[in-house]
Amino acid sequence: MARIAGIDLPKEKRVEVGLTYIYGIGINRSREILKETGVNPDTRVKDLSEEEVNTIRDYIGKNFVIEGDLRRTIALDIKRLVEIGCYRGIRHRRGLPVRGQKTKTNARTRKGPKRAISGKKNK
């Protein structure tokens, strides 16, 4: 089983897809990694040689911020926005959409479930 960046890649999947299990690596970045390291994207993870796994591991380690470091960086960026009190920071603090979406009717995912307001119904 190939273990890269602390993640066990699924054995039966193609390497191209298996790399996307690592936080911070999507399908395009996965293709770029495989192209640069010279590994065939159609190879199954279980069929990778130890040398290929090490090549991929080294390339990712040198060129990308992934997993815990990326999560920490994102959390610190959000914390900084909240602390300086900018518009985006205020939106994060209030749990509202940050990127300019309308909130009158939508944004349920970000705002959470509806809360009932007592005394509103007409009798």
From Swiss-Prot:
SUPFAM superfamilies: S13-like H2TH domain. Keywords: Ribonucleoprotein, Ribosomal protein, RNA-binding, rRNA-binding, tRNA-binding. Pfam families: Ribosomal_S13. The keyword Secreted does not apply. It comes from the Bacteria. Residues 95-123 are annotated as: Disordered. Gene3D superfamilies: 1.10.8.50, 30s ribosomal protein s13, domain 2. Belongs to the universal ribosomal protein uS13 family. Located at the top of the head of the 30S subunit, it contacts several helices of the 16S rRNA. In the 70S ribosome it contacts the 23S rRNA (bridge B1a) and protein L5 of the 50S subunit (bridge B1b), connecting the 2 subunits; these bridges are implicated in subunit movement. Contacts the tRNAs in the A and P-sites. This is Small ribosomal subunit protein uS13. It comes from Clostridium novyi (strain NT).
